[in-house]
Swiss-Prot record:
Entry keywords, A to Z: Cytoplasm, Magnesium, Metal-binding, Pantothenate biosynthesis, Transferase
Keyword Magnesium appears in the UniProt entry: yes
GO CC annotations, alphabetized: cytoplasm
Record's cofactor remark: Binds 1 Mg(2+) ion per subunit.
Any Gene Ontology biological process: pantothenate biosynthetic process
InterPro entries cross-referenced by the UniProt entry: Pantoate_hydroxy_MeTrfase, Pyrv/PenolPyrv_kinase-like_dom, Pyrv_kinase-like_dom_sf
Gene encoding the protein: panB
PANTHER family on file: 3-METHYL-2-OXOBUTANOATE HYDROXYMETHYLTRANSFERASE (PTHR20881:SF0)
Molecular-function GO terms, alphabetical: 3-methyl-2-oxobutanoate hydroxymethyltransferase activity; magnesium ion binding
Organism lineage string: Bacteria, Bacillati, Bacillota, Bacilli, Bacillales
Enzyme class: transferase
This protein's name: 3-methyl-2-oxobutanoate hydroxymethyltransferase
EC number assigned by the record: 2.1.2.11
Pathway named in the protein's UniProt entry: Cofactor biosynthesis; (R)-pantothenate biosynthesis; (R)-pantoate from 3-methyl-2-oxobutanoate: step 1/2
């Protein structure tokens, strides 16, 4: 079973960490079979699998539902579950209640929060025994304000991001995710921090990489970010669906090969 200690040893020995964002049992099972080190159950499931326009409509119960499914599919993988918008940054009592509910109900290894303003929450959650992963740079929950664009691309912004990253580690974050920032900045942060730093759109010099399952396998996704590489093409499944549709309508499916051979109506008629 992958643990935080395992991830820390990987960083110390300069072994790259692989992470995939997945949302259900079959994708998690495949990730574990592929020996992926970490799985993130991201609130991006709102757009990717629930068809919402953003993450705003994703609830804590949604995250618990999908987190449980992922855990069942990849029980030996280090699993992180997002705290969705509206569940953190409230009062200390509400924040910790939501974090504990998510952590306990999913049996995840950590919860993840976005933004540099949550140091107090990270400290309190850590003290309670809940491991927290921090996410800086482009933070999807704030994309309505900051837009989908490169972050940390000025001297001032880069210096602030380094400061924020250090603050996350000091507060107790166990892993840091950096999204859509210059690669040299990501390298500098990775070198300055002792905790694992996972990049997405942050170059190759972070301690690891994360991509969304559906993006990297071209599964039901219309647009791809610059930093996404497609490692397989699941959209070919559409051809299979078309063929199925045609064969059903033509009456050629199911054939004898897909039909049980047992005949029963002769017995029924004899009984009558």
């Amino acid at each position: 079973m992958k643990t935080l200690n395992h991830l820390n040893k990987m960083k110390a020995s300069q072994q790259k960490i692989s992470m995939v964002t997945a949302y259900d049992y079959p994708s998690a099972k495949q990730a574990q079979q592929a020996e992926i080190d970490m799985i993130l159950v991201g609130d991006s499931l709102g757009m990717t699998v629930l068809g919402y326009d953003s993450t705003v409509q994703v609830t804590l119960n949604d995250m618990i539902h999908h987190g449980k499914a992922v855990k069942r599919g990849a029980s030996d993988t280090f699993i992180v579950v997002d705290m969705p918008i509206g569940t953190v940054g409230l009062s200390d009592e509400e924040d910790l209640k939501n974090a504990l509910k998510l952590y306990q109900n999913t049996n995840a290894n950590a919860v993840k929060v976005e933004g540099a303003h949550l140091t107090s929450f990270i400290q309190k959650a850590t003290k309670m025994g809940i491991p927290v992963v921090s996410h800086l740079g482009l933070t999807p929950q704030s994309v309505g304000v900051m837009g989908y664009k490169l972050q940390g691309d000025t001297k001032t912004a880069a210096m602030q991001l380094i400061k924020d990253a250090k603050a996350m580690e000091t507060a107790g974050a166990v892993v840091l995710v950096l999204e859509a920032i210059p690669s040299d900045l990501a390298r500098e942060i990775s070198q300055q921090l002792t905790i694992p730093v996972i990049g997405i759109g942050a170059g190759k010099d972070t301690d690891g990489q994360v991509l969304v399952y559906h993006d990297m396998l071209n599964y039901g996704v219309d647009r791809h970010a610059k930093f996404v590489k497609q490692f397989a093409d699941f959209s070919s499944g559409i051809d299979g669906l078309r063929q199925y549709n045609e064969e059903v309508k033509a009456g050629t499916f199911p054939s004898e090969n897909h039909t049980y051979k047992k005949r029963i109506m002769d017995e029924v008629e004899q009984h009558d």
